[in-house]
Amino acid sequence: MRGTLTLLNKWDARWLEIAGVVSTWSKDPSTQIGAIAVKDKRLVSTGYNGFPRGIQDYDDRWNNREEKYKYVVHAEMNCIYNANYHNQSLKDSTMYIVGLPVCHECAKGIIQAGVIRVVAEFKDAPLKWARSTEITEKMFKEAGIIYDQI
């Protein structure tokens, strides 16, 4: 359910602020998304929408939407992959995401990684993603994941 920042505690607000900073690391000229994973008030992993490790992020790849989508790893999945790369478990963690709601593909990864709560801050999502975000909400509910949308 969509809420307001006033409903969150001070730690949620702080972590969302950090996820917002992480989103600025993305080189995507049109969409910047940031995700962080937190466990026991400790930052475990970060991710932003970008290309996989070692893949050149040429301007022509970023500026052509059709081409870009073939390369980009979503922030949530990058957060999961980065945790794995650094031998960090996301089991029982909270993921904070700034920019867009969680798509159904990222929801699957979040569930499989053992995240127990997701806090997503975003403005209105594009209508074309309505079905994807609807499926995300259903999967999170069924998996027992708390999903706070702001």
Go through each PLM region and give its residues.
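Zinc-dependent deaminase catalytic domain
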Residues: 1-150
